[in-house]
Amino acid sequence: SVTWGLTITDREKNCYPSQLQQMLGNQYEVKNFGHSGATLLSHGHRPYIDQKEYQEALDFKADLVVIHLGLNDTDPRNWPEYSEEFNADYIRLIDSFRQANPKAKIWLCQMTPIFDRHPRFESSTRDWYNQIQRHIRQVAKATGLPLIDLNTPLYSRPDLLADAIHPNAEG
């Protein structure tokens, strides 16, 4: 939902893939293949690999791929039961993009913050969030892929996440 642009006014213009397109200019074609509520976990409540956006992303055969998944995996329906599958599922996702375009450059993202005023924060979500961040770092190290830190720049700016989880257009 962060990639898709949930809660953003004029989403198609202001979601981060659209802003990235504006920054990069016409030399690049940036597409938004995010799906609101999607999980990285293939046994999660809404696996990204089962969404049409995933197949569209593979069919696009991107030269550059940015993956930001994991926030929805903090849901109690997902992490407690399937956490041990996270790294393998992530590597399978990466491999699918490599298979679609063997020359693709791929970046993984540390998740954007979840602030304490979010309703799920009081459950074990905070602990699971930190565990998932560690798993993402492990996957980046195991695959040799670069890691984009989306947490640190936003952590001190809760004003940029109106609902405590989804960045606004400025965020």
Name the predicted role of every residue range.
Residues 113-150:
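Substrate-gating cap/lid alpha-helix
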Residues 93-97:
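Hydrophobic positions in alpha-helices of CheY-like receiver
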Residues 67, 107-110:
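Structural beta-sheet core signal
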Residues 29-31, 105, 144-146:
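Conserved beta-strand segments of alpha/beta enzyme cores
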Residues 100-106:
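A short helix->loop->beta-strand "cap" motif at the edges of active sites that frequently abuts
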Residues 146, 162-171:
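Histidine-centered active-site loop/cap adjacent to the catalytic His
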Residues 2-91, 127:
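Conserved SGNH/GDSL esterase-like catalytic core that processes O-acyl groups on lipids
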Residues 32-34, 110, 149-151:
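Residue-level recognition of beta-strand->loop/alpha-helix junctions
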